[in-house]
């Protein structure tokens, strides 16, 4: 489906047109329907919208779609486009009028392109008439160009509309399947309910088992057995009703099943119709590549004709030479005879193709109308079946469950009676506790009594079906009487104790009652035995509440103190920069001067101590200083005179300084411009380094992907090698087996033919040599001997037929095991074709099994099934015609070397595929080896590796500030984060900035770019010719010399103590 704007795409099912919009534009489902009405003029009640999986689009789905779209906008991501398919309910009636009404806004009538005005013009026309014709032809040309563009747009739109219409049919079929699935699910639920009842309530189960059980168990709370609570006649009637309901439901469900099967057949016909329509109406944009090419040539031709026309119209006949006028006339004739007919032909061709697309679309719409009508009929049938049968089935199932409960009461009665006894004991115990509690507490009796009544009502509702069996004595009046006087309760009920209940449970165990029922009674009795008449005190509750509140206050106080302590700790850590994470303001490198720098006061004391030493030493030379003072006074006088002279010169210099101020301003501007250019160059260099890092990572990722692909290919090659070897082995075994079988068959045929000829010869000799008497005497012996020979020949013939069929069946299994299927062609001629996935259904044990019996269901060939049927018939009839027919079928299979040629060709294809895979693997292996050879190493460098060399930052003299900080970087030997140091002031006026390469000192060291290798540095040995004029280079390491920084070792780069560094000799290989 083509790209549309927005996150919602609406598709018109009958026209195939689509519209893109945003779902958040609509507030409600009705707003979306109004948008559909405006676009496609479908009445609101007739709009029917489906989702891509066939479900009906409802308000809940619309709200979910809107909420997801809003969430996607809030998160700043683009939501995937949802597709909805819009149908017109009127089209499901199947009428042509509904189709015409639904497509009246979509129907288009194409107009055939008109002929050019130049077609009817004469060859020789006047100047004025020619100008008029050419001007008119320009208008015709513009109209034709518009028509051609429209025709081509119609063709492209038809391809997309066809795909949308076929997709709408598929979605509608899924909708019908979902609708039918709901009905089938109801049917299966009903059938399972009936089967469950049939399994739980088997015939005579309650008579054979439960009746004997009830007659055995004593009703300990009353006289007699439990059977006194059961009405046997009522149970018999319930059994008869159950059987009748089962028969009635089975009949109704079979009718319902028939309706579902009929509907399934209709759906299958609709699916086949949709599939057949999709096969007949197939089109693709690639089928119209010629039209697109013609459209491109058409544009060029139109452009050329317009230029030629303007050239002719712009000519001035009064000033044009005769030669130019002659060329204009020839150009006019050529245009009339060649260009204009060609343009008209292109327009007519596209008109014809567009009209054909319109006709095809109208035909497809009529086909869709029939399919929509069939879907409506199928849906109506489903609804009728549901309304007519399912409702009655539900009523009968409800009655079936009710009857089942009556029968199940018999089997549940022992357990319920046990619960009844336990409840009697609990009530007796409760009343005793209440009587005792009443003397002490009278205020809470009403609430306790109310809870007891609620519990009794719940128990009665849980076992309401047994209410007519057990008769409760109403003690509510006596409970009310309890509040009027202080006399204890006197309720006439049996006295039940725990021993009685335990005796009843033991009786159930002796009668083989289910173990889970006994466990239930024991558990319930255990709970009731622990029952205590306890009433909660409101005072205790209030105290508990107060203690809980105080504990909550203490917890909240501790939480506040913890929050304050965490805030103080955070402030302390924030003020201490040494605890900050590693970054720009806090380096993770070791500061060797930390806590070792003298304070300001210490420095002042040291300087004071040095000045005192100098004074003491100066006293020893006081005399010399006095003589020097006299000389200095003389020089001072001379200097004063010189100062006067300099003052005069200063006045003149000031005037010169005023003039030099302007020059200084200009110099500042120039210097600022140079600094800006220098900053740009530095930024460019940083960007280049980052690009190199990214390129190296990308290269490594691609290399890893290539390695994984090569490993996968190697695994595939090994798999195909083993598979080819297995197939070759199977081929050789089968060919050898087939050759042996054929040789044995031919030898047996030859022996049998020889025996037949010999027997015939002996028979003829005996017939000629005997006389009438001997004939009479031996007439009873010769037929017997001949009959024996004939029977032996039949037995031999039968074995030959079995051997021939076994060889044939083995050959068919061989073919299907290698993916070949024996079938019949259109002319009933045998052919062997390649079928993908055929080998998956073949059991490998067929090949290894030595048994002559082959499972015919595993063989997919229809020809094999036909031959097997002939062979089976031949075993029964042994007729001559059947034998000849059987042999002729086998001869058709082996004639013209069809079997041998197919097997050899199949194995040849497998061998060619293996060779192709080996060739591809060899090529990819060479690519990987080349990549491994050319990859750049960034850590654990060795001799022979390729490495990226970059210059380090800073001047060689500034060891402590620039070089040391650069070389101490934990990321690599090159500092990629700090800017370059400022240049000396004295040389600023001599800087010359080139437009491509920044200034670099010759003594700047070069280092290898490494990643994540701490404590090791690699520096390039001095080689001015190798790095001259380069910002970086890729080199191959020739040799490496290891150094470790200690007190006496070599340390030209002022590295910290303990640092390991290598001096590398490399040769430049290439530049990336």
From Swiss-Prot:
Predominant place of localization: membrane
Swiss-Prot/TrEMBL keywords: Autophagy, Coiled coil, Membrane, Protein transport, Transport, Vacuole
Coiled coil segments of this chain: 615-804
One GO BP: cellular response to nitrogen starvation
Pfam family, one: ATG17_like
Entry GO CC: Atg1/ULK1 kinase complex; phagophore assembly site membrane; vacuolar membrane
Topological type in the membrane: Peripheral membrane protein
GO molecular function, one term: protein kinase binding
Location of this chain's protein in the cell: Preautophagosomal structure membrane; Vacuole membrane
Highest taxon above the source species: Eukaryota
Functional description taken from the UniProt entry: Involved in cytoplasm to vacuole transport (Cvt), pexophagy, mitophagy and nucleophagy. Recruits mitochondria for their selective degradation via autophagy (mitophagy) during starvation. Works as scaffold proteins that recruit ATG proteins to the pre-autophagosome (PAS), the site of vesicle/autophagosome formation. Required for the Cvt vesicles completion.
PANTHER family in alphabetical order: RB1-INDUCIBLE COILED-COIL, RB1-INDUCIBLE COILED-COIL PROTEIN 1
Protein family membership: Belongs to the ATG11 family.
Subunit architecture: Homodimer.
Entry protein name: Autophagy-related protein 11
Lineage start: Eukaryota, Fungi, Dikarya, Ascomycota, Saccharomycotina
């Amino acid at each position: 489906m083509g790209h549309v704007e927005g996150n919602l795409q609406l598709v018109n099912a009958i026209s195939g047109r689509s519209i893109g919009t945003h779902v958040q534009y609509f507030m409600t489902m009705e707003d979306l329907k109004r948008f559909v009405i405006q676009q496609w003029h479908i009445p609101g009640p007739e709009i029917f919208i489906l989702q891509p999986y066939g479900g009906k689009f409802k308000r809940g789905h619309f709200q979910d779609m809107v909420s997801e779209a809003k969430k996607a906008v809030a998160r700043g991501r683009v939501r995937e486009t949802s597709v909805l398919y819009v149908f017109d309910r009127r089209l499901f009636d199947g009428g042509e009028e509904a189709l015409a009404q639904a497509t009246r806004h979509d129907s288009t009538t194409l107009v055939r392109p008109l002929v050019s005005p130049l077609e009817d013009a004469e060859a020789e026309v006047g100047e004025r008439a020619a100008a008029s014709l050419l001007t008119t032809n320009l208008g015709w040309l513009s109209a034709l160009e518009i028509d051609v563009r429209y025709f081509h747009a119609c063709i492209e739109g038809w391809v997309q509309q066809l795909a949308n219409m076929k997709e709408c049919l598929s979605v509608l079929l899924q909708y019908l399947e979902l609708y039918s699935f709901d009905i089938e699910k109801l049917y299966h639920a009903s059938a399972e309910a009936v089967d469950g009842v049939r399994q739980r309530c088997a015939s005579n189960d309650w008579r054979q088992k439960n009746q004997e059980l009830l007659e055995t168990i004593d009703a300990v709370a009353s006289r007699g057995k439990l059977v006194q609570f059961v009405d046997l006649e009522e149970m018999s009637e319930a059994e008869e009703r159950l059987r009748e309901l089962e028969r009635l439901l089975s009949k109704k469900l079979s009718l319902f099943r028939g309706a579902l099967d009929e509907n399934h057949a209709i759906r299958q016909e609709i699916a086949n119709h949709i599939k057949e329509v999709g096969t007949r109406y197939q089109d693709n944009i690639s089928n119209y590549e010629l039209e697109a090419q013609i459209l491109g040539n058409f544009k060029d031709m139109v452009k050329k004709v317009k230029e030629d026309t303007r050239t002719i119209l712009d000519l001035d006949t009064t000033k044009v030479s005769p030669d130019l006028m002659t060329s204009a006339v020839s150009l006019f004739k050529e245009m009339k005879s060649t260009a204009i007919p060609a343009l008209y032909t292109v327009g007519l061709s596209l008109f014809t193709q567009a009209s054909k697309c319109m006709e095809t679309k109208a035909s497809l719409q009529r086909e869709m109308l029939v399919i929509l009508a069939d879907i409506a009929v199928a849906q109506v049938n489903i609804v009728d079946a549901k309304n007519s049968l399912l409702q009655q089935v539900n009523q009968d199932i409800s009655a079936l469950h009710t009857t089942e409960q009556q029968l199940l009461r018999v089997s549940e009665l022992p357990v319920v009676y046990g619960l009844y006894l336990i409840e009697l004991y609990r009530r007796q115990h409760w009343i005793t506790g209440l009587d005792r509690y009443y003397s002490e507490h009278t205020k809470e009796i009403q609430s306790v009594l109310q809870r007891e009544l609620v519990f009794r009502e719940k128990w009665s509702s849980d076992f309401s079906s047994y209410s007519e069996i057990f008769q409760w004595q109403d003690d509510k009046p006596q409970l009310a009487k309890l509040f009027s006087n202080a006399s204890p309760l006197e309720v006439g009920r049996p006295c039940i104790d725990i021993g009685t209940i335990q005796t009843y449970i033991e009786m159930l165990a002796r009668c083989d009652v289910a173990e889970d029922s006994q466990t239930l009674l024991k558990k319930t009795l255990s709970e009731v035995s622990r029952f205590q008449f306890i009433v909660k005190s409101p005072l205790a509750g209030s105290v508990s509440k107060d203690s809980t509140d105080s504990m909550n206050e203490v917890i909240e106080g501790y939480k506040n103190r913890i929050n304050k302590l965490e805030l103080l700790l955070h402030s302390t850590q924030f003020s201490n920069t040494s605890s900050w994470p590693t970054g720009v303001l806090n380096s993770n490198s070791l500061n060797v001067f930390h806590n070792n720098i003298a304070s300001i006061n210490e420095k002042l004391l040291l300087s004071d101590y040095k000045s005192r030493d100098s004074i003491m030493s100066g006293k020893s030379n006081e005399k010399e200083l006095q003589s020097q003072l006299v000389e200095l006074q003389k020089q001072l006088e001379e200097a004063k005179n010189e100062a006067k002279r300099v003052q005069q010169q200063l006045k003149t210099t000031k005037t010169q300084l005023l003039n030099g101020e302007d020059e200084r301003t200009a110099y500042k501007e120039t210097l600022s411009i140079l600094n800006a250019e220098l900053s740009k160059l530095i930024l460019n260099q940083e960007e280049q380094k980052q690009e190199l890092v990214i390129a190296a990572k990308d290269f490594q990722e691609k290399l890893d992907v290539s390695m994984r692909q090569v490993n996968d290919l190697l695994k595939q090659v090994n798999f195909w090698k083993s598979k080819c070897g297995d197939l070759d082995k199977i081929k050789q075994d089968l060919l050898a087996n087939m050759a042996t079988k054929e040789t044995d068959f031919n030898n047996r045929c030859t022996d049998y033919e020889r025996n037949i000829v010999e027997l015939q010869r002996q028979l003829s000799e005996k017939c000629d040599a005997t006389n009438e008497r001997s004939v009479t005497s031996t007439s009873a012996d010769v037929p017997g001997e001949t009959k024996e020979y004939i029977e032996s020949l039949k037995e031999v013939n039968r074995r030959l037929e079995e051997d021939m069929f076994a060889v044939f069946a083995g050959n068919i299994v061989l073919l299907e095991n290698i993916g070949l299927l024996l079938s019949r062609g259109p002319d009933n001629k045998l052919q062997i074709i390649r079928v993908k996935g055929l080998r998956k259904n073949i059991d490998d044990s067929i090949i290894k099994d030595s048994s002559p019996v082959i499972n015919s269901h595993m063989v997919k060939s229809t020809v094999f099934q036909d031959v097997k049927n002939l062979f089976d018939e031949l075993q029964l009839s042994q007729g001559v015609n059947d034998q000849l027919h059987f042999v002729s079928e086998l001869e058709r299979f082996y004639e013209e070397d069809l079997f041998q040629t197919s097997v050899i060709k199949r194995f040849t294809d497998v061998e060619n595929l293996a060779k192709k895979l080996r060739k591809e693997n060899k090529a990819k292996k060479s690519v990987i080896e080349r990549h491994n050879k050319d990859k750049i190493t960034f850590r654990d460098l060795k001799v022979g590796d390729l490495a990226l060399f970059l210059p380090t930052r800073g001047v060689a003299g500034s060891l402590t500030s620039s070089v040391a900080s650069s070389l101490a970087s934990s990321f690599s030997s090159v500092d990629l984060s700090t800017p370059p140091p400022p240049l000396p002031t004295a040389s600023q006026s001599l800087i010359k900035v080139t437009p491509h390469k920044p200034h670099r000192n010759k003594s700047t060291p070069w280092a290898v770019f490494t990643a994540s290798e701490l404590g090791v540095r690699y520096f390039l040995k001095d080689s001015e010719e190798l790095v001259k004029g380069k910002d970086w280079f890729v080199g191959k390491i020739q040799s490496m010399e290891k150094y470790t920084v200690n007190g006496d070792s070599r340390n030209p780069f002022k590295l910290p103590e303990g640092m390991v560094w290598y001096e590398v000799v490399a040769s430049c290989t290439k530049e990336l």
